[in-house]
Amino acid sequence: RNVANMVIHTDLNCLSVVQYAVDVLNIKHIIICGHTNCGGIKAAMGTVQDLGLISNWLLHIRDLWFKHGHMLGKLSPEHRANMLTRLNVAEQVYNLGCSSIIRTAWDKGKALSIHGWVYDVNDGFLIDQGVMATSRETLEITYRNAIAKLISEANELSEKTMHEKEVEQEIQKLQEALAEQTVAE
């Protein structure tokens, strides 16, 4: 558990917890769980340059933000943050699956699954992000599929947002025309 559910290959605290769970406790499932309205995600997207030590931690999310900015920039701020949260979950599942701890466990034939979920703080639902890995092969496949799905959803949301803006502009024009007509009468 950390700010923005990050799995960084130099974070010895995170990796030691994972190694103990996998090698000693023989756990079968690991869940990477982000949440909507995440302050870490919002901070990474912000323009504030220096938040102290947390700025270094959030650089990984800023990289993700810049990597997918072409699709995220068209979304409303709320949708943008939630989409980045979902992308981050997929990315962290991938990072964990690429760690030597998990790869060694899979190579030894351990039954170990990594799941990517998002907790929606508005309604309390856990949403499976469709990125679940039980081997190196499934990691690659589900990661690519999850990213493709998120890009598709972002494009749909972007088109919907653009359409809604056009409708709002038309309504405003009609209201202005009606107001002018009322004044003229």
Predicted segments, located by residue:
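Ordered, amphipathic secondary-structure segments that act as subunit-interaction surfaces
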Residues: I30-T36
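Divalent-metal-activated hydrolytic enzyme cores
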Residues: A4-K28, G39-E185
